[in-house]
Design a protein with these regions (language model features):
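N-terminal secretory signal peptides that target proteins for export/translocation
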Residues: 1-15
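Short linear motifs centered on Gly/Pro in flexible linkers and helix caps
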Residues: 5-7, 26-27, 285
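Bacterial N-terminal signal peptides
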Residues: 16-29
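N-terminal secretory/targeting leader peptides
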Residues: 35-127, 144-146, 150-357
Length: 357
């Protein structure tokens, strides 16, 4: 539909009716191209969220500007209760052309992509997101796991922290029986191994759970705490022992319907490619890191309590991580995916790209 304008040959008008019809069709196509294309871009982020203002909106503007106004992204935020599964269906059916997904259960629907949600090492969302993009690319996950959708970028968020309503977690013994909310079942095995009682609920439902004291706290990234507007509901924040792997990682992905991409002229496809990939994933990760830093500063300004679990808890933390990883390896093996090899390769990429680690 969006073809290049056609320069007509001087003798073309002397042809018959068929030629006239073809020329009319080219003229219509050329007119559509001249006016550009508008793609619908959906996500479940609040319009004033850090991710919206620091990445989603600027990214859409860059595509518009670099295409000289020929590609516009109409941002239509979904209800914040919309799940990743619902948004995935939206882009598959092309109700929207581009979507940003926060994945609740990547291990179930996207098992290879979900390896990066395991309790592996990491330091920054910026480096980890660059590693995740590379992982997605070299494993051809757009085709293999995202049903041939075009993966534009991927993000591994900052490390989760225990955010507690009242009392800080000073040692792992404090977690015994504690009801800890998590946004993904991927962390359930790990938390159980620490002695806690995990409560798997959507991120948006955590507000009510914390406000109504139905959970004692949440294991969530700082950026997630800010995005879900939970900061005023918790008073104490406890980090993993020094040298410990992350408890898990929240994963997100930016997807485009392939028919929408194919509808573009070649030069406009290049614009989309220019704003896809490793650097864009790192851009997302950097904005996540900055959001996390700002959230920690606000907590300090409120006078919240900060603790780091002691070195004596490191072995138990690592043991819980190993149990969670081994369980996933068994699941991957059952799918014929060579789990141990995948874990080894994922670790190598994180070490390569998360250079601060």
């Amino acid at each position: 539909m969006f073809a290049h304008s056609i320069r007509r040959h001087p003798n073309s008008c002397s042809c018959g009716l068929v030629t006239s019809i073809i020329l009319l069709l080219f003229a219509v196509a050329g007119n559509a191209f001249a006016h550009g294309v508008t793609f619908k871009f959906q996500h479940a982020q609040a319009a004033d969220s850090a991710l919206s203002t620091q990445f989603l909106d600027p990214w859409a503007k860059k595509i518009h500007d670099d295409s000289r106004g020929r590609v516009s992204l109409l941002i239509t935020p979904q209800d914040q209760h919309a799940t990743g599964t619902e948004l995935f269906q939206v882009v598959l059916e092309r109700t929207a052309d581009i979507v940003w997904l926060d994945l609740q259960q990547p291990a179930v629907s996207f098992p290879i992509f979900g390896v990066f949600g395991l309790p592996l090492a990491g330091t920054t969302a910026e480096g980890s997101s660059r590693a995740l993009w590379t992982w997605t690319d070299i494993n051809d996950l757009g085709f293999r796991e995202f049903k041939e959708l075009r993966v534009l970028a991927a993000a591994r968020h900052d490390t989760p922290v225990f955010h507690m309503r009242e009392k800080a977690v000073s040692s792992l013994s404090d977690l015994k029986g504690a009801r800890i909310a998590i946004p993904t079942a991927d962390a359930e095995t790990f938390l159980t191994g620490l002695g806690a009682s995990p409560v798997v609920i959507s991120g948006i439902a955590m507000r009510d759970a914390l406000a109504q004291s139905s959970v004692d706290g949440a294991l969530l990234s700082w950026s997630g705490l800010a995005a879900l507007e939970l900061e005023e509901l918790v008073k104490a924040h406890s980090s993993a022992p020094v040298g410990a792997p992350w408890a898990y990682a929240e994963l997100s992905v930016l997807l485009m319907n392939p028919d929408a991409y194919r509808s573009l002229a070649d030069d406009l496809k290049q614009v989309v490619r220019n704003y896809s990939g490793s650097d864009v994933s790192a851009w997302i990760g950097k904005s996540i890191d900055e959001t996390a830093s700002d959230a920690r500063k606000r907590a300090a300004d409120r006078g919240d309590t900060f603790t780091t679990l002691p070195e004596s808890d490191l072995d138990k933390w690592r043991e819980a991580a190993s149990v969670a990883i081994n369980k996933r390896v068994a699941d991957l093996d059952a799918r014929g995916l060579h789990g141990e090899e995948l874990i080894t390769r994922a670790r190598a990429l994180i070490e390569q790209y998360d250079t601060a680690n």
